[in-house]
Amino acid sequence: MMPSHATMSSPPAGTKLDLSKKLSELRASRRSHSGPSPREPTPVTPPLPSPPDLSTHTYTRPVRRILSRKDHETFLASSTYTLVVSFTFSLSDSVRGRAVTDNKDQPASPNISRILSVIDTIRQLVDKHPSIDQGGSRFGNPAFRDLFDDVAAQNATWHREIIGLQNADAIEEVSSYLVHSLGSRDRLDYGSGHELNFMMWLLCLRQMQMISTADFPMIVFRVYLEYMRLMRQVQMTYYLEPAGSHGVWGLDDYHFLPFLFGAAQLVDHPYITPLAIHNTAVLDEEGDKYIYLDQVRWVDSVKTVKGLRWHSPMLDDISGAKNWLKIEGGMKKMFIKEVLGKLPIMQHFLFGSLLPADPSMGERSDDAQEDDLHDHGNGNPHARHTDHFGDCCGIKVPSTVAAGAEMRKRIGGTGLRPIPFD
């Protein structure tokens, strides 16, 4: 029997919907279906193996080897996976309980200075390749391809003349990770996979004994922060689209590591609690010392809507955690599950001689066509055509950085940002 209109669940005329309640229900639903379970133990940092003996080493050009779900599962059980986790977590552990300013008077080692010089050289190239006027478009600016090509053209020279590598094959292998840390030339996007490429560039240099464990705090506080600032400049200049964005339900449209490194810094802090991210005064006073606070400050500054509750509900939810140790553990779980554990991200991971693939993993016969065939982890690989719709076949997602920048252009200055439903 069809229900009568009297028994339908539609609200009576004039009844005001409680949208905040709906949002809370949606949050609870999303939390129950995504993210690591709080009952999962915090991942431990695997021992970092000593760098290999490279005296008779043969270098190879990095290629993609994760072509299927089986390849991904093989990677997750491999020594390279353990090395990546160990290196990343060791960096995070090296800054636990330390402020960025703790190292401000410490001189950088010669190799750290060389790495910083390369990042600064790329920053200067951004100024030489201004964005193309797209009439207010918030999608990726094609001028990024000019920057990418310029970096690719000079990359080998930098590794020879600045970094100090002399072996041509070693330069080809190591430099591949740096150029692919800027974003996708084809898709005009940037995400945690590109950020991971930057860390793999550093890991390769560590495997070549150009970075020591003693350098790890400086890697986070100087090298990584300079890279992140470079990428903010790139995002503001070229409006790169967020690769594989989760929208408001993601931690951040572009970066993950600021939250891992930043949470480690704040473990056992005497007065900055997780809820402090809602206090503008704390962000302004402490943001230059703590990466987590700086990233929250940045995210809030580029959004068109005011308030973490509306534009970053995941960060808002995390702020309710008991302490920073809980958040640090959660970030380690997320790195394993949401970065290394995601096939759409890891199918772009590059394997060479320093970060070797398991011999059983797939191989492409034509590396030039790597972007044309991809898999979502459902066993159905398919082609991506020239008129693709962003990363992994979702609809194209405009740059959130661009949205804020274009709004400020229209209204002038920073302006007041609207609160949803207000």
Curated annotation (Swiss-Prot):
Alphabetized InterPro entries for the sequence: Phstyr_phstse_ac, PTPA_C_lid, PTPA_sf
Q: According to its UniProt record, where is this protein located?
A: Cytoplasm
A Pfam match: PTPA
User: Where does this protein have compositionally biased stretches of type Basic and acidic residues?
Assistant: 18-28, 361-377
Give GO terms: molecular function aspect only.
peptidyl-prolyl cis-trans isomerase activity; protein tyrosine phosphatase activator activity
The chemistry this enzyme catalyses reads: [protein]-peptidylproline (omega=180) = [protein]-peptidylproline (omega=0)
Q: Where is the composition biased (Polar residues)?
A: 1-12
GO cellular component, as recorded? cytoplasm; nucleus; protein phosphatase type 2A complex
Q: Which UniProt keywords apply?
A: Cytoplasm, Isomerase, Rotamase
Pro residues bias (residue ranges):
38-52
Annotated region Disordered: the residues are 1-61, 360-389
Listed under GO biological process in this entry are:
mitotic spindle organization
- E.C. code: 5.2.1.8
**Record's family?**
Belongs to the PTPA-type PPIase family.
Known function: PPIases accelerate the folding of proteins. It catalyzes the cis-trans isomerization of proline imidic peptide bonds in oligopeptides. Acts as a regulatory subunit for PP2A-like phosphatases modulating their activity or substrate specificity, probably by inducing a conformational change in the catalytic subunit, a direct target of the PPIase. Can reactivate inactive phosphatase PP2A-phosphatase methylesterase complexes (PP2Ai) in presence of ATP and Mg(2+) by dissociating the inactive form from the complex.
Which PANTHER family does the annotation name?
Answer: SERINE/THREONINE-PROTEIN PHOSPHATASE 2A REGULATORY SUBUNIT B, SERINE_THREONINE-PROTEIN PHOSPHATASE 2A ACTIVATOR 2
Instruction: Spell out the protein name for this chain.
Output: Serine/threonine-protein phosphatase 2A activator 2
Protein species of origin: Aspergillus fumigatus (strain ATCC MYA-4609 / CBS 101355 / FGSC A1100 / Af293) (Neosartorya fumigata)
Species classification: Eukaryota, Fungi, Dikarya, Ascomycota, Pezizomycotina
